């Protein structure tokens, strides 16, 4: 008596109690469905709000449960769709970040998983989507990192590094490099050597030939901001091609955890 129920969105499947609040984790649909039915909903979808997922290159990052959720992706989330009905807006009462600890042995590791993405999620919760600005946020993040350093929060520092991705443009597979640090230069090499302030300057996505060992870092004022990130990229006859048959569930598609609908490398082929 006098208590309210709150549960993950699976409780939608068994019929909701009149006072039930739904935590929408399997995407946003559960929260929308609950709100339409007049129930409060907390938006905590796995693709954006699970802070135990990878936030930097999985090959070199500490082991997590999986997924791939960057600082920028977390910040991009809009918990209340702009075109939502008033009833839905009324019943979406907030956002929630989740961390499951089975891969985290200590507080330092939990700091690494939570920050800085918890800051992005907090701003997402208290700022109207129309007023959010990624460039403003990442400029302010520089001071936030200074504050975290002072109070000994061991945040992930991928903000100062370069993210290496691949995407298909007009049927052609290209390498895409990005750093979250504002106004930084990206310098890279393709032979496995560490980039310097005089290495090739990244200006736009580029095509590569054969197999390369791509190494990249962010620089400002001639100084490297973070660490060097690397990825071996392979080019062969199937690179960038779309599926012609339904793939087996276990095949890896896209560049990271199946985010693109192209098959990059079932096998590595070094010759035609």
Functional labels for PLM-detected ranges:
Residues 267-272:
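Conserved small/polar residues in nucleotide/adenosyl-binding loops
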Residues 5-7, 22-24, 41-44, 93-97:
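Hydrophobic faces of well-ordered beta-strands that scaffold small-molecule active sites
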Residues 10-12, 25-27, 46-48, 98-102:
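Active-site beta-loop-alpha junctions enriched in small/polar residues
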Residues 1-20, 25-33:
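Active-site neighborhood of glycoside hydrolase catalytic domains
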Residues 55-56, 60-172, 180-184:
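Substrate-binding clefts and catalytic carboxylate motifs of secreted carbohydrate-active enzymes
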Residues 132, 138-266:
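Short, compositionally stereotyped local motifs that mark structural "simplifiers"
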Residues 2-9, 41-45, 128-134, 156, ...:
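Acidic/polar loop patches that form or flank catalytic/metal-binding clefts of enzymes
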Residues 19-21, 32-42, 46-59, 63-66:
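Polar, glycine-rich mid-to-C-terminal structural blocks
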């Amino acid at each position: 008596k006098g208590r309210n129920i709150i549960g993950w969105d699976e409780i939608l499947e068994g019929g909701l109690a009149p006072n039930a609040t739904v935590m929408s984790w399997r995407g946003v649909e559960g929260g929308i469905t609950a709100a339409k039915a007049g129930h409060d909903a907390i938006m905590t979808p796995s693709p954006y709000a699970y802070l135990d997922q990878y936030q930097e290159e999985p090959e070199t990052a500490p082991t997590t449960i999986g997924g791939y959720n960057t600082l920028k992706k977390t910040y991009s989330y809009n918990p209340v769709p702009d075109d939502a009905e008033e009833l839905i807006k009324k019943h979406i009462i907030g956002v929630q970040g989740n961390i499951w600890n089975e891969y985290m042995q200590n507080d330092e590791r939990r700091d690494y998983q939570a920050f800085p993405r918890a800051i992005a999620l907090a701003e997402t919760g208290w700022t109207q989507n129309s007023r959010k600005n990624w460039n403003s946020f990442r400029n302010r993040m520089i001071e936030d990192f200074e504050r975290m350093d002072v109070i000994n929060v061991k945040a992930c520092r991928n903000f100062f590094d370069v993210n290496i991705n691949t995407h298909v443009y007009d049927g052609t597979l290209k390498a895409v490099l990005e750093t979250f640090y504002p106004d930084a230069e990206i310098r890279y090499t393709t032979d496995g050597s560490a980039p310097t302030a005089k290495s090739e300057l990244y200006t736009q996505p580029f095509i590569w030939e054969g197999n390369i060992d791509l190494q990249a870092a962010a620089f400002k004022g001639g100084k490297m901001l973070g660490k060097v990130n690397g990825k071996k990229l392979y080019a062969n006859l199937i690179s960038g091609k779309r599926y012609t048959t339904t793939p087996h569930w276990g095949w890896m598609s896209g560049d990271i955890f199946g985010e693109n609908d192209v098959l990059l490398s079932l096998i590595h082929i070094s010759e035609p």
